[in-house]
Curated annotation (Swiss-Prot):
Residue numbers annotated as active site: D234 (proton acceptor)
Gene Ontology molecular function terms on file: ATP binding; calcium ion binding; protein kinase activity; protein serine kinase activity; protein serine/threonine kinase activity
Functional description taken from the UniProt entry: May play a role in signal transduction pathways that involve calcium as a second messenger.
E.C. number(s) listed in UniProt: 2.7.11.1
GO cellular component: nucleus; plasma membrane
Origin: domain of life: Eukaryota
Lipid attachment residues per UniProt (N-myristoyl glycine): G2
Name this polypeptide is given: Calcium-dependent protein kinase 16
Lineage: Eukaryota, Viridiplantae, Streptophyta, Embryophyta, Tracheophyta
Species: Arabidopsis thaliana
Amino acid sequence: MGLCFSSAAKSSGHNRSSRNPHPHPPLTVVKSRPPRSPCSFMAVTIQKDHRTQPRRNATAKKTPTRHTPPHGKVREKVISNNGRRHGETIPYGKRVDFGYAKDFDHRYTIGKLLGHGQFGYTYVATDKKTGDRVAVKKIDKAKMTIPIAVEDVKREVKILQALTGHENVVRFYNAFEDKNSVYIVMELCEGGELLDRILARKDSRYSERDAAVVVRQMLKVAAECHLRGLVHRDMKPENFLFKSTEEDSPLKATDFGLSDFIKPGKKFHDIVGSAYYVAPEVLKRRSGPESDVWSIGVISYILLCGRRPFWDKTEDGIFKEVLKNKPDFRRKPWPTISNSAKDFVKKLLVKDPRARLTAAQALSHPWVREGGDASEIPIDISVLNNMRQFVKFSRLKQFALRALATTLDEEELADLRDQFDAIDVDKNGVISLEEMRQALAKDHPWKLKDARVAEILQAIDSNTDGFVDFGEFVAAALHVNQLEEHDSEKWQQRSRAAFEKFDIDGDGFITAEELRMHTGLKGSIEPLLEEADIDNDGKISLQEFRRLLRTASIKSRNVRSPPGYLISRKV
């Protein structure tokens, strides 16, 4: 799917690059977004400026933007939604029964118009029975000229159904249809867009305390989506509405028109999103849930300083900034912003998605968590994925990770402590097979059979007592790439300390005998050593050990663990 953005020349941001020497105007936003599907139909061009524009006052879908990466300037085909197949007289959407209720007119009365676009309109409506006011998106079936347009509508309804009940997602009530239209009935949000509140603030900035409250709510949405195997793909201030005009009103995510489901380990290869918020890996056509976290990092940066972290006069220029440059944390007001806030934003704007904080990890960060409750932190899908991968690692890789886990301090383990506590339901300090089953066998994008869950617990349970304690959990759940990216000096220290647990004589190498002594493995140890011995000198150097820790999947090298192993002690 292709993307095309509104002209970046009309937008402003934070001047960082030497190629952009001119000061930026105040934060304003131009939205000009050709619609992707009937679910994303707000196609009007709006100049956002707090001096002249009224606030939005209801739940209304806005068309997500599509763009092209700077390299190659390749634009993908976009099928015209107004075109029809040769000989086709009835639009595809009018020939399809969506399976939705057919009694909309009997249940609701349409009121004032809230917004409109190429595919339809959004209205205030009233429930005839209860008198409750709702938002109704009316989508014209005649505009659904191709099957994918119908699938987009069905997918968005499915997503809204899945997320309904989350405190920070606009509530879905029902979907209806008649011969001409589809009606999506949702919660009415009358507090306006997050974007409008940013623009209304002095210098378009939030206080740190207020910004943290907003960011925490966005992260909760992202974490819930990711746990369900869903990526929002268009996180930006325009897609968050306040329930009411009250200052402490909850924030509600809306516009899931670009959202899609993804299986663990898979990537999206199309380019979707909005220029200022798009992640580097999206432009490289290899994106996943991490891209949502990047977008929240951009929003966090804007909330704190009133400027965009990546800016240029053209869209291609913005993309180059995103791919090559780092955000500026030196100019005002950053010197007056807390180190904790800066650390948080930096860890969300890491260009390598593997080293970026996950949404659930970010919720454990001290800057966001202050005033929050650990019980509010959801299970991190990446932690569950790491545990699933741990069983696939060779014995040597598992032992190395256990050694590394013992070198980390409480601050470094704060997010994993939250995750452990979330899985340890009975709070007895260990994870049982049943608790592991509850965490791994839920309605995730994948469901594991009981035998598979037992296999994972057995692999993590290094002392074979039938439970997983916190140390064992850390070894299996660690994000090694993050350790190195966030603090390279600490990474050097921690990885060396882990290496020295194997290097018993302190000569700077791990020999086969030292490997046997540390692991307690019986039988031939050479196959295990050869796995990490890149230069084939019969021993493992510190550099080779670090490479072992970084390697994604050691078993892909087809090295078999020695038979008859026996774990003599816990690492």
